[in-house]
Amino acid sequence: LMWRVAQREAKTLFLILFDVDYFKQFNDMYGHQAGDDALAAVAKCIGDNIRRPLDHAARYGGEEFIVVLPDTTPEGAASVAEIIRSAISDLGIEHSGSEFGHVTASIGAATWTPEEDSEVSAVIRVADEALYAAKATGRNKVELSPVHTS
């Protein structure tokens, strides 16, 4: 829905993908109930840290979450992503399988601009590539893609 609104109103849209670091190991060490509890805490944390009425957050699959920020600058999206990354880390959920000692998240973000003629799946792919770059370069960090072009 937000995608269609952004297209119709010719406004920029930012997609932010979050992936809980080492989540399979977390489930293996602490059990699936603890994993479910950790995901619920992360989801609440994400929801608590998006402020504007049209910003949306959802579970994207497994241990991944997506945030949609309509009419947002790259600087604004980076700020929201960093606030959420820090807040997830500050939850302090113990995770001895992580080099950080607690649950963290890696984050990738991408933008869609009105000048583009791409589908939402292309922007999700670019955000996913940024997410994997964050994981490959140390985890528990935010990686913004360059401005997406179709």
Report residues per predicted region.
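Catalytic-core segments of nucleotide cyclases and related cyclic-nucleotide turnover enzymes
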Residues: P74-E82, S96, W112-S150
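Hanks-type protein kinase catalytic core
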Residues: P53-L54
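Conserved beta-strand cores of small sensory beta-sandwich domains that regulate signal transduction
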Residues: F14-I16, A58, G108-A110, E143
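Catalytic core regions of nucleotide second-messenger enzymes
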Residues: R59, I88-A105
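Conserved long alpha-helical elements within nucleotide-processing catalytic cores of c-di-GMP signaling
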Residues: W3-L15, K24-D48, A58-G62, I66-V67, ...
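Short hydrophobic/aromatic beta-strand micro-patches
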Residues: V68-P70, A110
